Swiss-Prot record:
This is Large ribosomal subunit protein bL31B. The lineage of its organism: Bacteria, Bacillati, Bacillota, Bacilli, Bacillales. GO terms for biological process: translation. It holds the Pfam family Ribosomal_L31. The gene is rpmE2. NCBIfam families: L31 (TIGR00105), PRK01678.1 (NF002462). The keyword Amino-acid biosynthesis does not apply.
Amino acid sequence: MKAGIHPDYKKVVFMDTNTGFKFLSGSTKGSSETVEWEDGNTYPLLKVEISSDSHPFYTGRQKFATADGRVDRFNKKYGIK
């Protein structure tokens, strides 16, 4: 790797603004806000709107839309089961 062209990779805390869930991960993104983590160290705080704690796919609250096909519409129209 060339020196001086890559961004600094450091540990940051991501916080889900909907649920307040926090997790520690690595990122090149920085922030002026900081938070003290469970290990006693202070890390930059990055706020996110959606994480695995609030996304419907991961929480099991996902809704599936079923679209009726042509055969289903025909059967419904003519009362065929």
